[in-house]
Amino acid sequence: MEYDVVIVGGGPSGLATAIRLKQLDPELNVCLLEKASEIGAHILSGNVFETRALDELLPNWKELNSPIKTKVSKEKFLFLGKTKSLSWPTWLLPAVQQNHNNYIISLANLCRWLAEQAEALGVEIFPGFPASEILYNDDGSVKGVATQDMGIDKEGNQKDSYEPGIELLGKVTVFAEGCRGHLGKQLIEKFNLSDGKDPQ
């Protein structure tokens, strides 16, 4: 299958990328692969969410039935010891650590909602299709990904439900797997992307 853009990963970054691409060029063929059975299934974290990026991506997000509803009403900053804690006044914290006007959200629900927005723009989303292999052109550039075969037993034999993996080719492939993505690690090694870099 051929696309203009193939996105690997259905978290906030991958979904925001898909949305922005379709906003900029509605004619682009964009697909997004997510390894989980549904968008948000592997996003288990809660979050204190600052909306600036969402305000830029979807300025009318409040009108789109977003799951972002609960504003931070109170916060504390504590230094924790073995037996005691020390409270620190929040007004002494740097602005980036203050949560005034931020929201308390479920990242899973945010991702599900972002997926709805992406699909409404024409993004094709394929949950339950983990990308298992990076595909390369002869010149070494990335040309897409392949999904893993389905219906394989523990010994590696094909079951009756076997379906071969598919190749998704893109003029551009975006890897948005998160910091522990196995394909991203392969790219970092192949192209020496971490040489001379601080991991933070």
Protein language model regions, located:
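Helix-loop-beta segment of a Rossmann-like dinucleotide-binding subdomain
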Residues: 86-107, 116, 144-146
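N-terminal FAD cofactor-binding segment of flavoenzymes
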Residues: 35-84
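Predominantly flavin-linked oxidoreductase catalytic cores and closely associated redox partners
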Residues: 112, 117-200
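N-terminal Rossmann-like FAD-binding beta1-loop-alpha1 element of flavoenzymes
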Residues: 3-31
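Glycine-rich, phosphate-binding/catalytic loops in enzymes
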Residues: 24, 47-50, 190-193
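Short, solvent-exposed loop/turn and secondary-structure capping segments
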Residues: 42-44, 89-90, 185-188
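Conserved Rossmann-like nucleotide-cofactor binding loop
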Residues: 13, 38, 180
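Short, hydrophobic/amphipathic alpha-helical packing segments
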Residues: 12-18, 108-115
